[in-house]
């Protein structure tokens, strides 16, 4: 005995790629997603440059953890590091900082809740 099953073919909707702006804001947001990284940025913003040891002395975390947070900020492009053997000097990447300010500003402006929306 044969049983015929009726099958439906569903057209798979193509998933859209994220825009470069969405990708960039996600990278910045990820880098800003930890209080230690925010503290590092506050610390660097008050100075032109500073060394790893200065940053470590300011934060209540291990050196290895400071390194990981600096790497995350550097990978996102929010800071830059310059080797001055045997030390590394860090500063805020001003160009990318301006880009971050612009795209976050646009993001919040464009995603604002309308008065008649379900947001309260």
Model-derived features: where do they sit?
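Glycine-centered, phosphate/nucleic-acid-interacting loop/turn motifs that mediate DNA/RNA or nucleotide
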Residues: 77
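Short beta-strand "wing" residues that participate in macromolecule-binding interfaces
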Residues: 81
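Amphipathic alpha-helical dimerization/coiled-coil segments
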Residues: 1-25, 43-46, 94-120
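N-terminal helix-turn-helix DNA-binding core of bacterial DNA-binding proteins
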Residues: 23-62, 84-96
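Residues within the DNA-recognition helix of helix-turn-helix
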Residues: 69
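Juxtamembrane helix-loop transition sites at the ends of transmembrane segments
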Residues: 54-55, 63, 110-115
């Amino acid at each position: 005995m044969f049983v015929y099953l009726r099958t439906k073919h569903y057209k798979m909707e193509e998933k859209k790629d994220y825009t470069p702006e969405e990708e960039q804001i996600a990278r910045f947001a990820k880098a800003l997603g930890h209080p230690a990284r925010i503290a590092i940025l506050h610390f660097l913003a008050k100075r032109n440059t500073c060394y790893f040891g200065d940053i470590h002395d300011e934060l209540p975390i291990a050196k290895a953890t400071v390194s990981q947070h600096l790497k995350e900020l550097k990978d996102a492009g929010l800071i830059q590091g310059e080797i001055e053997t045997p030390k590394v000097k860090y500063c805020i990447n001003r160009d990318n900082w301006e880009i971050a300010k612009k795209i976050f500003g646009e993001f919040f402006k464009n995603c604002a809740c309308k008065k008649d929306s379900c947001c309260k």
